[in-house]
Amino acid sequence: MIIIFVHEAGHYLIGRWCGIKASVFSLGFGPQIVGYTDKRGTQWRLALIPLGGYVKFIGDEEGLHGTSSQSLPIVDGSFGSAHAWKKAATVFAGPLFNVLFTVVILTFFFFTYGRVAIEPVVGSFVKDSPAVQAGLQLGDRFIEMDGQQVESFEDLMNYVTFHGGDPIEFKMERSGQVFTTVITPKVVERDDGFGNRVRSGLMGVGVPVDPDNPARLDPAYVKHIRYSFGRALREASKRATFIVTQTVFFMGRLLGGKEDHCRLSGPSKTVKIAWQVSETGFLSLLNFTAFLSIGVGLINLFPIPPLDGGYLLFHVVEIITGRPISAKIREIIFRLGLCFVLLFMFFALFNDYFCWFS
């Protein structure tokens, strides 16, 4: 619920900043459990069905963005009386706050606990793997991948996982000499740790291990990085940007039929993962919350009503053309978008169970 609260708080706070008055701030849908009305006249609610939330602004009786074909009176301080850029900012604020919330969580994580990282050095190979075929040797160090700096083995694995079948240009260091090579990770099927078989990229390199105990990492290549607040903020922003770009990349591949649909998490799979992660400790749950918050923000930016991105598109068109899209056209697009979203939700739910039992 905290992710939903952050999302709706974004709409509410930026709406207030733009001079738009809110009549309702609700966590959940359906019958009210508890609530109170503040001095500004906003009713704060906790509702029975915890599947989302909403902010209802004055003069926007159909919800946050107004889809009714009926003309509503323009009242000072209402959503309808606001300039298009203010309405766009209010709509965009929800997903933006989700991303900022992730940055806040990760900044706290890096500043308080730091980061244990394995240096990106080749410690072993999988036989006949793409890395072997490319001529890599033990002790080779990864410097860059497709122009991005490689700071840890985790960075390397995260990137390769999402780029199975795609050529990746690596900048490597060997005995003080820098060279460039292109490696195409092969696509393999593996267990994702949550009972699903998924496809992912495999390059075939392993971490450096202790020569005296191959079951342990070589301590010479393990470093505990401590961050000042400024560095923690920069690292958190960098990590959040990476999550956003890889999520967008994944969705593009999924829609293009190039990604394993079992990597998509619907509501039931998300709850299952959250429960399993919570059993491993607070830090793991905190990290999962950061990832989930960005996911909620990005999904809401899809340019399809009733998602935020659909209404944001309406307001951007109004900014460009100088006049709003007619209420009738908005309502038609809304109904089509709602059907699409419901179908996608049904697919995500069915996909969860299909991937569990297939």
Swiss-Prot record:
Q: Which family does it belong to?
A: Belongs to the peptidase M50B family.
Record-annotated active site: E8
Q: Which NCBIfam families does the record match to this protein?
A: RIP metalloprotease RseP
The entry's protein name is: Putative zinc metalloprotease BH06270
Q: Per the database record, which ranges form the PDZ domain?
A: 102-177
Superkingdom, natural source:
Bacteria
Q: Which residues cross the membrane?
A: 89-111, 282-304, 332-354
Q: How is the protein disposed in the membrane?
A: Multi-pass membrane protein
- Predominant location category: membrane
Q: What class of enzyme is it?
A: hydrolase
Any one GO MF term held by the record is:
metal ion binding
Q: Name one GO cellular component term.
A: plasma membrane
SUPFAM superfamilies, alphabetized: PDZ domain-like
What keywords tag this UniProt record?
Cell inner membrane, Cell membrane, Hydrolase, Membrane, Metal-binding, Metalloprotease, Protease, Transmembrane, Transmembrane helix, Zinc
What is one process in the GO biological process aspect for this record?
proteolysis
